């Protein structure tokens, strides 16, 4: 029985109890949200080290960190270091997007070591293997693809990105309308190339019931990928993107009917004034399925700073109702991220998520900020560092820029506003 099936018959699972305790919500309320499909709890029965997290309505905004080998950098040990950095920085989930070296070993090591939710994009491995076996990705067979999907599910992957909405109809609509950046999703481009070469429908769409059978067997959550996500602002919210979203909404319904949890992936590159509309469309067309967004990035001109462009968009998206943010690192559009890039990406996404949780009024979010305000008023530097989203960086700045034992900070010194006002009000900062 999957998490969804259990919830639908009123059965509280251990995963639901764990998530409810962490989120400080009633388990009965959480179960109702899971039963309705508005919350997913990705829990593969073979991921034994997992500490489950819930994604969806009424819960804290979650953050995912991508890692994985490439053909240029196939070092598994380096990616496992990134895994630990991401976990230490507070990532709720990680995705192994490996395309180089021993892909199976990398994934299995990530699953074995990660207490966080683990996701993959199976088409990546299927494509790499087709290239090695046949000399061309377009020669991949339907069975090749589903063999990889089942293998990854059996290994313990909690959710998989599957670009089921890239259909012949959607691709034709893209061709007719035209785009500046065309298709930027790797999975979407692989499938489009395969479809056009073989003159066949997307196997993930044509054989969706087969996909559902595998997902139900292992309780793998489907993350319905946006293969037509906009890769630049000029392409945002166009016909192809929305047509794919309509199809994904229909596939969400079919997944729920089959007892399989599903969430929906979203853009991408979106100008600020279109973000709220994108969230509204997903929630409406996909019947409030949890929304997993890549950023979105709000400008195309900041390579090297795209963790910031994504955090700006992510905060607005999550405040409008998105549930899950995929981090973007400073290396986005430029190269494979370093350990430092991974940390920066996770922290930026967490800031965005927390800012959104404040706007949503989620339990606990406001108390965290109130505690920080009290510590600042009291000039309690140790408490401020403890409460910081990134205590390590806060501690470094405090030590580097201030004399040991200084009551105020080096920005204001004797002219500290907290101290001066506290003294005039007869309420010294140190005792606030």
Curated annotation (Swiss-Prot):
- Presence of the UniProt keyword Zinc in the record: yes
Q: Which residues bind [4Fe-4S] cluster?
A: 409, 412, 416
Residues binding Zn(2+), per UniProt: 269, 333
Q: GO terms for biological process?
A: thiamine biosynthetic process; thiamine diphosphate biosynthetic process
A GO molecular function held by the record: zinc ion binding
**Cofactor remark:** Binds 1 [4Fe-4S] cluster per subunit. The cluster is coordinated with 3 cysteines and an exchangeable S-adenosyl-L-methionine.
Associated pathway = Cofactor biosynthesis; thiamine diphosphate biosynthesis
- Which domain of life does the protein's organism represent? Bacteria
Which GO CC annotations does the UniProt entry carry? cytosol
Its EC number is 4.1.99.17
Q: Which residues bind substrate?
A: 66, 95, 124, 163, 185-187, 226-229, 265, 292
* Catalytic activity from the UniProt record: 5-amino-1-(5-phospho-beta-D-ribosyl)imidazole + S-adenosyl-L-methionine = 4-amino-2-methyl-5-(phosphooxymethyl)pyrimidine + CO + 5'-deoxyadenosine + formate + L-methionine + 3 H(+)
Q: Which keywords accompany this UniProt record?
A: 4Fe-4S, Iron, Iron-sulfur, Lyase, Metal-binding, S-adenosyl-L-methionine, Thiamine biosynthesis, Zinc
Named cofactor requirement(s): [4Fe-4S] cluster
Record-annotated disulphide pairs = none
> What's a Pfam family this protein contains?
ThiC_Rad_SAM
The text of the family note is: Belongs to the ThiC family.
Concerning HAMAP family, the annotation shows: ThiC
What is the purpose of this protein? Catalyzes the synthesis of the hydroxymethylpyrimidine phosphate (HMP-P) moiety of thiamine from aminoimidazole ribotide (AIR) in a radical S-adenosyl-L-methionine (SAM)-dependent reaction.
Name of the protein in its database record: Phosphomethylpyrimidine synthase
User: Could you tell me which species this protein originates from?
Assistant: Moorella thermoacetica (strain ATCC 39073 / JCM 9320)
